[in-house]
């Protein structure tokens, strides 16, 4: 378990940029440094607004805006936090305004944790987009076609094996790692040929995650 925690801490706290996560890590590193230099006395709403403004400036400087049109004719589905569009026969793109997270940094941390655990459905960050005067992240993910309904008991068994224990409904926690894993219902975890694919995940890092024990 310690080796896993060391690896995850290195992913979240390190500055390396490699492979398809390079743009994702670039943004996460910027947000982490911004958080470290910002006043801890700012309230959450004010800080996230300032964070978004700084993020827009950073995205302009680094040319991180997704300039292609996202057409509603390619719309597939939506949830409270994002909208999903077909990109081609292999991939979908998702727009997410990070409403499930206190800060944009938390959202990008969640993407990095997802990519560590679930490389088969890894997110590739492809840019930001302003939609209706709001900032959205745009990510690409391989499309998963299901062959059967998801067995939530199998999801629970899989997560328990990996030391994520059910707390309520479809929410889990790994207390040793300090990671909360939420909202794992049958639209966020898909099943193809009896293999589970985690396609929409929400990870939160607790203070325990940052400890050295």
Language-model region placement:
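ATP-binding glycine-rich loop module of kinase domains
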Residues: 38-48, 69-120
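Structural motif
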Residues: 87-88, 131-133, 192
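Active-site-adjacent loop/helix micro-motif of nuclease/hydrolase catalytic cores
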Residues: 100-109, 149-154, 210
